[in-house]
């Protein structure tokens, strides 16, 4: 046994208990570990650290900061791994357990009752842990670089987000991914790469987040690390770089440790311990301890160096410098090469793979080292995208002064034909710097939580500057200014008040009344109101909200409870924008829409138990859509009435027609007309605004303006009013009262015919657009039944995992009884037939030859698969079915699937598209809905 120079955690002592005993409440807490006292102790400890100069220094140095998330399929071990990370970092004094409901990050009652993660939890800790007195001898990264030591020897601040795995909480994962710099993807060593894992993996690719893979649960019967590695290559579309291989011991293949391919060391954990006692063997010691493992470790090192050499020229040079000996290439060189490949422009061509068993307390510390060594800090992550008015750029370009404000792409074709319209206006560096000199901070609100004690907590990621206490934050989405009276750093459900949140960090603002998920918040020095133009339009890339597919009615127990219920719903919608609330005009019922049955059940529990709303929820139903079948005649409406005591008058002409990508590609798109000033696709509908006679020019600052509009109506509010009017009309179909889908609306507002001077207010214009669009929709239904509207239903992309014995019964049930269409049926589902075609995944797949992937042999397998030799599949090999099935047929499907598969089948699904229903099916659905 030897010391481990690459394992910084092995030489650092945990925080001493004496540190906690300074608290007067701590006398009996270490024996009974009462939950309240434990929470207080953690809070007391971090408050004491926050005052130290060391922590302040750690906050400033972004290169020692990691904003990471844990992503995975449900039950892969995300929360269990998080609890071990907190324990080894010294944040907790005992290991929380999901089954006991004692975890730190799953603190909601519903999470502890169901044993699943519902809400993403943010928590901050240090790895390796700081010493007990709040001072640290942690070396600088420059010193480590000079000594050829890894980054993991220096203590890093880790901001960790534990995300849900259930498909119903996809939005919770999406808004967490939006603010991460890196991620750890956890795989179940028995189940391998599962369907939800693929979906989350490709969602992370959209945000270009570097990821490492941790294969968990290797202690369980049936665990197959080698098979999982091959699935990483075939289903996650990247070359797996095996950085660790599992150490199986004894005749029954008992998992006892790992062999580190980078450092050529063996790590052996004490069975039944808390994971802090580790024996470390060098290669010579490992040959004496387990010769077969040592030989496999050498093969793994050869494969790793060869793989990196194909993607990194520096690794090739190092290989030749060390006499072409794979085993003598320095460990630090391999770490640098892995990091270079992971953070390079072609993100995730190489996927580092690690091994462990979090529940058995094995492999978590090396995983934390990998987070420090491989994943990027905030200063190394991709420059966030922003919009500034109608221009798209990056925040880095704005702050550096290298910014050219370009014309709006939506009106590019118009400008070509109208040479006198808006030209490209380029600001000089001096102009931009003068604008941004007073920009104090820029942050994204990625989550809103209602806390019973602290009020509304707005979680923010600061992208530039420093967000200071009592600063005035301007919301560029809502155009309101609010003061930030209190700032917190969150440790799951515990909070520490701070004076500022620096760039690159995650924190909480308390006291904001209006901020929502996805809003951009900026502050400027010396400004208490609106920032100067165009900074007041600066918006970070928003968080896309997926469309809801289920809905249920919400009714208060009495009329006196109506107000309380609406207030609770408003809080719930600020927390979770993937929920939608609408009012049925016919029945007057309040309808709550969401992503799935479990999603709505949790929302109901939150309303009743957390917000104390005295209300009940009706039966969960499916959200259908309505579509037009033909083009309507032009319908013109003039709105002429008083609004809030002021006369309003405006007009608009609307035409509605079917819309779809296939129709656009056939040349039916009319968006190239010279008079079109706005085009937007939203919720499957397309809205086009044409404004004949509205002459648009651009001033020296790049701002669009028009002298043809009334003085009280600027160009932006002119567009927005018409757009909102059309949106309002599309929210309810004329025949079945479902929201419209696959509908194109063309609005025409002629300056000479439809505008009436000072009487044409924004509200009057919006009302005219709504009336005209509604009239065009009704025009179709009154002409003829064949040219009216039809119904559309959500069709789901369903991925079912069953064993071989149940395959036939499940396929027959899907294709016959449920009217589904089988897309693929294979042991390893091709990525091209599953999630790569979903709107979330826009990354280009990497061509991976599975036969060239190195994977160590699994227990009880005779051939080594180091050279990619095939292994005969077991008789009851898990099979994957991919199908397209109407959502109506999938309601309550889990119980039926379990009866068909003897309780072993699982499935996940997401909305693939909305599809037109046949006349017979539409009639049956309407009869069921009593319409």
Curated annotation (Swiss-Prot):
GO terms for molecular function: GTP binding; GTPase activity. GTP binds at residues 72-79, 162-166, 216-219. It holds the Pfam family EFG_III. Keywords: GTP-binding, Mitochondrion, Nucleotide-binding, Protein biosynthesis. It comes from the Eukaryota. It is found in: Mitochondrion. One of its GO terms (cellular component) is mitochondrion. Its main location: mitochondrion. Residues 63-379 form the tr-type G domain. Transmembrane segments: none annotated. One of its GO terms (biological process) is mitochondrial translation. Mitochondrial GTPase that mediates the disassembly of ribosomes from messenger RNA at the termination of mitochondrial protein biosynthesis. Not involved in the GTP-dependent ribosomal translocation step during translation elongation. Belongs to the TRAFAC class translation factor GTPase superfamily. Classic translation factor GTPase family. EF-G/EF-2 subfamily. This protein may be expected to contain an N-terminal transit peptide but none has been predicted. This is Ribosome-releasing factor 2, mitochondrial. The gene is mef2.
């Amino acid at each position: 046994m030897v010391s481990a120079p690459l394992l910084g955690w092995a030489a650092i002592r945990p925080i001493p208990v004496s540190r906690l005993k300074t608290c007067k409440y701590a006398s009996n807490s270490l024996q009974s570990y009462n939950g309240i006292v434990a929470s207080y102790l953690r809070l007391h400890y971090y408050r004491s650290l926050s005052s130290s100069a060391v922590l302040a220094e750690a906050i400033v140095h972004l290169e020692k900061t990691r904003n990471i998330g844990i992503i995975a399929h449900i039950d892969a071990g995300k929360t269990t791994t998080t609890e071990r990370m907190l324990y080894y970092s010294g944040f907790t004094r005992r290991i929380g357990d999901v089954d006991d409901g004692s975890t730190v990050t799953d603190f909601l009652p519903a999470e502890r009752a169901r044993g699943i993660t519902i809400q993403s939890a943010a928590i901050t800790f240090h790895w390796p842990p700081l010493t007990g007195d709040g001072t640290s001898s942690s070396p600088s990264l420059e010193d480590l670089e000079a000594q050829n030591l890894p980054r993991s020897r220096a203590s890093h601040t880790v901001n960790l987000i534990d995300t849900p795995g259930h498909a119903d909480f996809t939005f919770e994962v999406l808004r967490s991914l939006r603010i991460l710099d890196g991620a750890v993807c956890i795989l179940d060593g028995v189940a391998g790469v599962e369907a939800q894992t693929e979906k989350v993996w490709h969602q992370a690719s959209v945000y270009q987040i570097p990821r490492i893979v941790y294969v968990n649960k290797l202690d369980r019967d049936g665990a197959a690390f080698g098979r999982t590695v091959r699935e990483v290559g075939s289903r996650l579309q990247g070359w797996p770089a095996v950085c660790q291989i599992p150490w199986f011991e004894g005749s029954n293949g008992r998992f006892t440790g790992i062999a580190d391919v980078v450092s050529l060391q063996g790590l052996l954990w004490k069975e039944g311990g808390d994971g802090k006692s580790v024996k470390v063997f060098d290669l010579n010691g490992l040959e004496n301890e387990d010769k077969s493992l040592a030989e496999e470790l050498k093969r793994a090192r050869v494969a790793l160096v060869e793989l990196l050499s194909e993607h990194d020229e520096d690794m090739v040079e190092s290989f030749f410098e060390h006499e072409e000996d794979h085993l003598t290439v320095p460990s630090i060189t391999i770490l640098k090469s892995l990091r270079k490949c992971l953070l390079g422009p072609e993100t995730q061509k190489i996927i580092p793979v690690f091994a462990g068993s979090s529940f058995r307390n094995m492999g978590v510390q090396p995983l934390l080292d990998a987070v420090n060594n491989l994943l990027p800090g905030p200063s190394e992550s991709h420059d966030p995208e922003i919009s500034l008015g109608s221009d798209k750029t990056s925040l880095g370009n704005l702050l550096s002064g290298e910014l050219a404000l370009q014309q709006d792409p939506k009106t590019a074709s118009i400008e070509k034909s109208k040479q006198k319209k808006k030209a490209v206006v380029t600001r000089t560096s001096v102009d931009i710097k003068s604008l941004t000199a007073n920009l104090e901070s820029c942050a994204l609100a990625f989550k809103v939580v209602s806390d019973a004690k602290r009020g509304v907590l707005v979680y923010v990621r600061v992208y530039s500057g420093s967000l200071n206490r009592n600063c005035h934050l301007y919301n560029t989405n809502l155009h309101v200014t609010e003061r930030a009276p209190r700032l917190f750093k969150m440790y799951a459900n515990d909070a520490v008040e701070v004076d500022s949140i620096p760039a690159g960090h995650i924190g909480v603002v308390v006291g904001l009344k209006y901020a929502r998920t996805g809003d951009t918040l900026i502050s400027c020095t010396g400004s208490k109101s609106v920032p100067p133009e165009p900074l007041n339009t600066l918006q970070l890339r928003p968080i896309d909200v997926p469309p809801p597919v289920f809905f249920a009615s919400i009714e208060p127990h009495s009329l006196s409870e109506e107000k309380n219920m609406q207030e609770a719903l408003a809080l719930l919608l600020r927390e979770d924008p993937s929920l939608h609330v609408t009012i049925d005009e016919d029945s007057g019922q309040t309808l709550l829409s969401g992503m799935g049955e479990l999603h709505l059940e949790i929302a109901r529990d939150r309303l009743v138990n957390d917000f104390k709303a005295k209300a009940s929820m009706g039966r969960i139903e499916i959200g259908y859509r309505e579509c037009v079948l033909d083009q309507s005649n032009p319908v013109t409406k003039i709105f002429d009435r008083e609004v809030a005591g002021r006369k309003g008058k405006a007009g608009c002409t609307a035409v509605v027609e079917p819309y779809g990508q296939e129709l656009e590609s056939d040349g039916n798109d009319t968006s190239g007309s010279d008079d079109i000033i706005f085009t937007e696709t939203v919720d499957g509908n397309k809205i086009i605004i044409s404004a004949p006679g509205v002459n648009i020019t651009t001033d020296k600052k790049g701002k669009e303006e028009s002298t043809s509009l009334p003085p009280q109506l600027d160009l932006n509010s002119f567009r927005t009013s018409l757009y909102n009017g059309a949106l309002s009309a599309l929210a309810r179909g004329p025949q079945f009262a479902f929201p419209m889908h696959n509908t194109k609306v063309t609005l025409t507002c002629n300056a000479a015919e439809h505008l009436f001077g000072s009487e044409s207010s924004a509200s009057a214009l919006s009302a005219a657009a709504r009336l005209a669009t509604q009239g065009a929709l009704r025009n179709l239904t009154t002409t003829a039944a064949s040219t009216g509207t039809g119904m559309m239903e959500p069709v789901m992309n369903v991925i079912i995992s069953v064993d071989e014995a149940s395959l036939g019964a499940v396929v027959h049930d899907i294709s016959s009884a449920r009217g589904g269409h089988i897309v693929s049926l294979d042991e390893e589902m091709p990525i091209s037939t599953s999630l790569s075609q979903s709107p979330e995944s826009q990354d280009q797949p990497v061509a991976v030859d599975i036969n060239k992937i190195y994977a160590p042999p699994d227990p009880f397998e005779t051939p080594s698969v180091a050279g990619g030799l095939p292994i005969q599949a077991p008789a009851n090999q898990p099979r994957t079915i991919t199908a397209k099935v109407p959502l109506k047929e999938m309601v309550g499907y889990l119980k039926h699937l379990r009866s068909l598969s003897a309780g072993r089948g699982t499935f996940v699904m997401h909305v693939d598209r909305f599809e037109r229903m046949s006349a017979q099916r539409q009639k049956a659905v309407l009869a069921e809905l009593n319409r």
